[in-house]
Amino acid sequence: MMGPKANAAAAGDLPEYAEVDPTGRYGRYNDVLGKGASKTVYRAFDEYQGMEVAWNQVKLHDFLQSPEDLERLYCEIHLLKTLKHRNIMKFYTSWVDVSRRNINFITEMFTSGTLRQYRQKHMRVNIWAVKHWCRQILSGLLYLHSHDPPIIHRDLKCDNIFVNGNQGEVKIGDLGLAAILRKSHAVHCVGTPEFMAPEVYEEEYNELVDIYSFGMCVLEMVTFEYPYSECTHPVQIYKKVISGTKPEALYKVKDPMVRQFVEKCLATASRRLSARELLKDPFLQVDDLVFCPGDGDYSLMNYLRQPYLEHAYSNVSMMSNGLSESIDEDTPTEDRWDCEDDDIKADGIDLFNGHEDEPLGNVDITIKGRKSEDGSIFLRLRIADNDGHVRNIYFPFDIEADTALSVATEMVAELDITDHEVTRIAEMIDGEVSALVPDWRPGPGIEESQDTTYCHNCGSNVSSCGSLYAYMSSAARGCQCAELHGRFEEITFQANGEQTDLQDSGGSSDDGGGQTQHVKDQEAVHSNGFVQMGRRGPRDQFCFSSFQEQSCSPRHYEYDTSLQAKGFDMKHEVKMAKYKARKMAHLRRAIHPSLDFDNLNGERRMKSSLNKLQSFHIGKNHNFRIPTCERSPGARDAEEDPDIFNLAYHSRHPDPGAQRARHCEVDAQSSPDLMFTARSYYTGAQLPTNLPRTKSVTLNAVDA
């Protein structure tokens, strides 16, 4: 048992309070938790509750000009301790220190810090977490603005929003500068310039200035940039805000829905929505969506487990991995609505695209559109990674028949794009089309897509990628929407590599004076009878085989050197292919060149040995046609042989996870001429009137 002397000694070792409130309940230490221009936050202790609190001290300086102002301000901040809301920082008490000209108020203390610090600490945040924070902040603002008279914060920013990290809660804090709006408008210019609405500078504003500041907070959350960080002086910020110029960070937001939501918050005062209206905004509506069961109110949605996309993905995988003997074979697939933690990590819609172990922004996706004179829309989707690999995807968009979601789903299925990019690409398409066509109304989202009508003739289990076999079958003879499938034209190249001369490479001779080119460093990929032989040499070599695995002999690849004497020009090959693509896109009913069948609209028959089956591909330095397959003896009728249709399907619908092997690894770098051709196609540059006939290196299959 400790005696009085021991207690006194122990008390002497304890740090002394630097200051005590008038009631003696709260004691302030000298430990500084945070410091701003006019406010310092200290660690303090509540002796009655036995818990640590935050002691906020604000320097008044020139805020108070008379005793009347002091009395008014004291009454206003005294009222703040009556605020009780789960998204408002608890305000225990406050008082004015007249002698030191300070305002002191005691609030709850957060160990996770401010939202800005928390956001910078956790870089990998899902879009649903951001929405969760937005709903909580707006809920707190709605509570403040619903008072009579309304309470406005006047200094809302991420530095004044605090996080309870173990529960994912955010609370609005730093209400020491808030004011009770006793009149119709406030008449004091107070706040942080980067977050102040234009009307604040005019000293004529209402509670909607908090909505403007909230929009800047959302912008900072998704870009990690302070608004108007491009400005070096407050005067520059003032000029931009007054003129209506938005911060440059806004134009770095690639998600059109996020950008549109921020723009609603930054609109002029007459058009700016209230907190109640923003809570009803579609961007924040999550009640109608399907969530994984979890402990919190807001769980991460697993888009790929919805039936609409589950069937589309499973059918492409089924036909690509060879798990079925026939394309039209039914495979039972449950409509899974449950979610696993691993699925959430793998399939969740990530605001910042990439895996956990990859750097932020590993893949950059941009979209750009062009509207022709006849009203048709052409879009280009550009996918680039940090390694310099660039994929340019060109496709038409029919504003009368297409929706962004259907086109994005079709693109993902056909071009082997990461599946969880479906909604991201759809939102980008909606945003670009809206910019080109002002009266365009975005199509239904994923949560609405199940009620939309879909073609079951060309779509296998409502998959937007469709089925070639179903299209070619007699059951789909009257189908029209299948003509849209295969609309995508893709060019893959290395962005920053060593330049090569196309004409020189096209005219180079083979070793041995035109003898058979031997394959070296071959890499074979077998997938349902499709065998691709890649090599690290001046040429790429391909061959088709039947669904039974066959060995491809190097003798199968023999180049016809007679074309070299005719001055084979690769640029004409590219131009011709792009001209064909533009022509078909202009008609809005383009069929991909790799599926060019004779008399498709009539008898839909295929010639023997698939002479018309072609595939245009930009390899290392050459363009060529894929050699025809030797028809199997047992296949007498191509129209009745499902393997042939499977083969045709795989030429257009690659297996997810094997796109690089299927499109040929590009080790050599692209020519500037090739990139210019791609750019010319997009910008609508005029092509020469007299184009030479397309030439291709003939690969004659020779029996071993």
UniProtKB/Swiss-Prot annotation:
Transmembrane feature ranges: none
Cellular component GO terms held in the UniProt record: cytoplasm
Residues that bind ATP: 107-110, 157
GO biological process: intracellular signal transduction
Catalytic activity line of the entry: L-seryl-[protein] + ATP = O-phospho-L-seryl-[protein] + ADP + H(+); L-threonyl-[protein] + ATP = O-phospho-L-threonyl-[protein] + ADP + H(+)
Entry's Gene Ontology molecular function annotations: ATP binding; protein serine kinase activity; protein serine/threonine kinase activity
Keywords: ATP-binding, Kinase, Nucleotide-binding, Serine/threonine-protein kinase, Transferase
Catalytic residues (positions): 174
EC number(s) stated in the UniProt entry for this protein: 2.7.11.1
Pfam families in alphabetical order: Pkinase
Enzyme class: transferase
Ranges where the record places region Disordered: 499-521
Residues in Protein kinase domain copies: 27-284
InterPro entries recorded: Kinase-like_dom_sf, Prot_kinase_dom, Ser/Thr_kinase_AS, WNK_Ser-Thr_kinase
Keyword Transferase: yes
Family affiliation: Belongs to the protein kinase superfamily. Ser/Thr protein kinase family. WNK subfamily.
Protein name as catalogued: Probable serine/threonine-protein kinase WNK1
Protein source organism: Oryza sativa subsp. japonica
Organism lineage: Eukaryota, Viridiplantae, Streptophyta, Embryophyta, Tracheophyta
Gene this chain is encoded by: WNK1
